[in-house]
Amino acid sequence: MKQAFRVALSVLMLFVAVAHAEVRIEITQGVNTARPIGVVPFKWDGPGAAPEDIGGIVAADLRNSGKFNPIDRARLPQQPTSVAEVQPAAWTALGIDAVVVGQVQPGADGSYTVSYQLVDTSGNPGAVLAQNQFKVTKQWLRYAAHSASDESFEKLTAIKGAFRTRIAYVVQTNGGQFPYELRVSDYDGYNQFVVHRSPQPLMSPAWSPDGSKVAYVTFESGKSALVIQTLANGAIRQVASFPRHNGAPSFSPDGSKLAFALSKTGSLNIYVMDIGSGQISQITDGRYNSTEPTWFPDSQSLAYTSDQAGRPQIYKIGVNGGTAQRITWEGAQNQDADVSSDGKSMVMISTNSGAQHVARQDLVTGAVQKLTDTFLDETPSLAPNGTMVIYSSTQGMGSVLQLVSTDGRFKARLPATDGQVKFPAWSPYL
């Protein structure tokens, strides 16, 4: 926990200029069918008002997961401040089988101790299912709340929580010297900061598996180039600037390789670079176009988009040789895949009758499920726990970020007010 705080703190210290117009999650569908839960306002043991509404953040996290529906505060049957004060029968009468209570204690040194308890109200009434406490400074109160959310979520679902993750995305603002910005924020849009500003387009950010670096495409030199930027110090390393197109970077899960697409020989092909040595190997070779690589968890094989069958479809190939295998067969065309961390499924953009939507394919059975009904969906990116997808879509005259659960039931959007938002990429666990 302390190590995670230090890593993230180094990032915040570098990027002190926070962008003014932050994105925020607005739920549009699905929360009413989720599992009800109680999240009580955390007891504040200090003078005046609490510096953060920790209970509100935990409730928002659980609601944003699409799996829980925290009861409105106005409907809380009681507001216990400790485990001993929880009256299980009052909660089970509302169909609630678990309650989160907590406390925030200010310290003389300027720190805060955030404590929480997840209490069973049904199976073993009054039993503590999970609990923890975090001593943090003021700027880390939201992180402490996300930590409580992660632990509660995992205890109740057996799925690792992803509330301490971040998203990277590109914002195109209106006018100014640097209209293109690569930004990073918490998964819920808070604590947004600018990683890089450019007078020319930025595209396709991709996270390193340890969350310390972001690869992306820049056109600042007048042509496309692939770079890797270290978040802690801002250092930028150029890794590819060949003739024609350099694009679609993707880190291998083990962090040793970077896959990308180059068109230096005419058509687009997939290449893989050993990050340590800089050696580049060509993976695909043909007159057709192959692009948008994404890794399987073994770091030895890739899914990618190719038009070798006439229209874009998704294929799988080993990075050490072998024949490519087509893995999408439903829909007029499929592209821009992101493989889940367990390798059992992927999300992609599927086009039928001229409409392109986010779809999920089970890689074991081949079954495909359409997840969205928004317009001109692009660049889906999975949360590291595989429960949610972030993507961009066209809304009105611009592009915005959207969220959808991988079962298609929960939907939300993250509107921004200062430009078009594209190319979202969900971070690994941080």
Curated annotation (Swiss-Prot):
The keyword Cell division applies. It is found in: Periplasm. One of its GO terms (biological process) is protein import. The keyword Cell cycle applies. Residues 1-21 form the signal peptide. Pfam families: PD40, TolB_N. Keywords: Cell cycle, Cell division, Periplasm, Signal. GO terms for cellular component: periplasmic space. HAMAP family: TolB (MF_00671). The Tol-Pal system is composed of five core proteins: the inner membrane proteins TolA, TolQ and TolR, the periplasmic protein TolB and the outer membrane protein Pal. They form a network linking the inner and outer membranes and the peptidoglycan layer. Part of the Tol-Pal system, which plays a role in outer membrane invagination during cell division and is important for maintaining outer membrane integrity. TolB occupies a key intermediary position in the Tol-Pal system because it communicates directly with both membrane-embedded components, Pal in the outer membrane and TolA in the inner membrane. Belongs to the TolB family. This is Tol-Pal system protein TolB. The lineage of its organism: Bacteria, Pseudomonadati, Pseudomonadota, Gammaproteobacteria, Enterobacterales.
